[in-house]
Amino acid sequence: MKVLGIRFCKVAKAEDAEKLAAMLGENGLGLTPNDMGPGDGFNGAVFPVDETAKDGQGSWVELWPAGENMPEMTMLQIVVDDADAWAERAKNNGVDIKGPDDAHGERIYYLDGPGGLPIAMLSKAK
């Protein structure tokens, strides 16, 4: 069982998310975002921080504008080699874990950390 990456996800008011993306981007801290394609206004930003992120397994920062189906929040996402095995371990250790959900080619489990921090544990879907 191995951790493959850590993702930081922030959903905020569109203006705040865009300003944070600008600060992290090439004219701020110098991170290079993925190309999100054309769109009207700010649609989000993903900043990979290692080469494996391009394969969907590494670490990155993702920023999204809040909307009707995406409320403001901060989430820690832990990318693992086998989400089912990690979830089983967590359950055996008494952690209240929800899931799995399969979305975007990933197997995802959810838990609430102390203080209410949403945490997702995920791997590529089998």
Predicted regions and their residues:
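A short, local hydrophobic-aromatic micro-motif
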Residues: 4-7, 32, 98
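Conserved short beta-strand elements that form part of the metal-binding/catalytic scaffold
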Residues: 29-71, 118-125
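N-terminal beta-strand motif that seeds the catalytic metal site of vicinal oxygen chelate
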Residues: 1-22, 27, 73-76, 125-126
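Proline- and acidic/polar-enriched loop/turn elements at helix boundaries
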Residues: 8, 36-38, 102-103
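Conserved acetyl-CoA-binding loop of GNAT-fold acetyltransferases
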Residues: 25-33, 93-96
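Vicinal oxygen chelate
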Residues: 13-18, 75-118
